[in-house]
């Protein structure tokens, strides 16, 4: 599908996502980007950052993106549809049921959800590269005008994202499983550990990598996540019910001493994780993990990444796990190719770092 630059783009809500869309759109050749925000200071900051050409209540445009919090989306989408005559209208919400219903079959509306983001907030942290390679769900309905869908598909592609069409209800079930359920479980596990004392010992103080890895998303911004949970309550409840059934299977296996079931269960999870990595990284079968012990010292991360970059060793992904000021931490680096992994390990060992290399699928 050909990428056709828009003449005018309107953005309603100029926070992190809205301002990032503005920056990316201007790089993609959109003629004019205008925006509005309930907080005038936020809109002005987006303008100062170069994400907007003008701040205006008149967002009539070829395309209007509504990028406000989930709870506000239905009302704001209705407002934009009423206030504009020609614009194709979309949103960026992570749940689709309520906002699609609010559009009431208007042929100009096409739901959207860029699967990306950041723990940072506001236009000060906007990034025009935020959508590069990201999945961007589009949720057309039977009422959606085909030409308007093509307009949005083309625009999303021009930002570097990968547009994927999906039924709105299927979208909400999908994100309930892949995003909302993990957030719920991370909070449950961490709160369970925080509320427990075992013969005077605090589980949080004794936490190892497993607890930290499993609860990375716990405690996310409640102003955002309470609305997401409630807006997708039906799909999330269904996902929790299926989760409960699977946990009960594990409980039954433990009670019966069923080692065979537990072994098959773990093997199935291992295969599913390999499949997930293969989707995220096309060369996942050749990915290698380098675990590097690093001191708690300014500049260590920059030094390692720059050293690998100088040798043209591409870092596919990395994670830094801090232990303490005295013990430093562990830097985990993913590198594609056994040769690159060996070269990276040798380079870092020559600089005095302890390195352990393993294939990701081991």
Regions found by a protein language model. Name each.
Residues 1-55, 63:
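NAD(P)+-binding Rossmann beta1-loop-alpha1 motif at the extreme N-terminus of oxidoreductases
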Residues 38, 68, 92-94:
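Short beta->alpha hinge that forms the Motif I/post-I loop of the SAM-binding pocket
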Residues 57-88:
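Rossmann-like NAD(P)-binding element
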Residues 76-125:
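Rossmann-like NAD(P)(H) cofactor-binding subdomain of soluble oxidoreductases
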Residues 130-219:
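Internal alpha-helical scaffold of NAD(P)-dependent oxidoreductase catalytic cores
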Residues 199-270:
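Interdomain hinge/lid region at the active-site interface
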Residues 272-362:
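A conserved regulatory-domain signal marking ACT and ACT-like small-molecule sensing domains
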